[in-house]
């Protein structure tokens, strides 16, 4: 084990995965290689991917324990209170983001998220988790983060939901924004963001974006069906062609 306040990192053996364990008094007066007292373990963080596990271990060695505790509290809230299913990588990405956000705040650097409006509109549930996160940062660390940071947290949550990279998540968000604008302008209508139809449309766009940016597009084997739709809804079909060309 390696001491770091109330936290330590343990390597079981060459075949076992690396884990981070947290608990009061863990690592106190301990020596490298010493067996950990199981009764002191309050939480075990285990990342199955070896690369992510190593990155996570190095990250928590240099950060205050409070950052990891805070990250765990936010993730637990998203899972248990909201019911989100998140990839294990969220422990690494969220803890790292919280660290940088607090560092920016302490340096007096204002962060402006260019996708804040889109995140609030297209990912309201995840944005709610982001607002919970900045509230907890304020309560626990007396650090006042803005809604732009809440939007960034939300993007990390979305990334963990769909198991895509942050860059892909941002690309998907931009795609949704642009397609919504194309539909609104081409059909000369104002989309009702509170409607069930709008929610379904956004959901379809999310999965479309995910397939596009992960290279998992579906085949186009039914041209007959497309012709039927074009005949029944010529204006809407023309709009979809404009989107396809985009």
Would you name each region that the model predicts?
Residues 10-13, 21:
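SH3/SH3-like beta-barrel fold
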Residues 5-9:
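Short, small-residue-biased leader/transition segments that mark boundaries at the very start
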Residues 17-30:
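A short macromolecule-binding patch
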Residues 172-189, 194-212, 217-232:
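Small-residue-rich helix-loop
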Residues 51-93:
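Ordered, amphipathic secondary-structure segments that act as subunit-interaction surfaces
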Residues 68-80, 104, 108, 120, ...:
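General marker for long, soluble alpha-helical cores
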Residues 88-103, 148-162, 199-211:
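Extracellular/lumenal glycan-associated surfaces
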Residues 77-86, 119, 134-144, 185-191, ...:
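Short, recurring structural edge motifs at helix starts
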């Amino acid at each position: 084990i390696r001491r770091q306040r109330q936290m330590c990192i343990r390597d079981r053996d060459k075949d076992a995965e690396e884990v981070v364990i947290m608990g009061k008094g863990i690592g106190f007066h301990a020596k490298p290689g010493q067996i950990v007292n199981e009764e002191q373990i309050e939480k075990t963080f285990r990342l199955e991917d070896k690369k992510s596990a190593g990155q996570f271990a190095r990250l928590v060695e240099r950060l205050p324990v409070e950052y990891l505790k805070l990250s765990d509290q936010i993730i637990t809230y998203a899972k248990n209170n909201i019911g989100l299913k998140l990839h294990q990588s969220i422990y690494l990405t969220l803890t790292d983001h919280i660290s940088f956000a607090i560092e920016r705040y302490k340096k007096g650097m204002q962060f402006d998220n260019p996708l804040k409006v889109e995140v609030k509109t297209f990912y309201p549930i995840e944005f709610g988790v982001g607002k919970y996160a900045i509230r907890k940062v304020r309560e626990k660390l007396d650090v006042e983060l803005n809604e732009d940071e809440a939007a960034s947290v939300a993007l990390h949550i979305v990334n963990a939901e769909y198991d895509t990279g942050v860059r892909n998540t941002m690309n998907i968000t931009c795609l949704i924004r642009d397609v919504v604008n194309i539909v609104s302008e081409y059909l000369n209508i104002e989309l009702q963001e509170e409607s069930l139809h709008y929610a379904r449309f956004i959901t379809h766009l999310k999965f479309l974006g995910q397939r596009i940016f992960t290279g998992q597009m579906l085949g186009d084997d039914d041209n007959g069906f497309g012709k039927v739709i074009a005949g029944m809804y010529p204006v809407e079909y023309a709009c979809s062609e404009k989107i396809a060309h985009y």
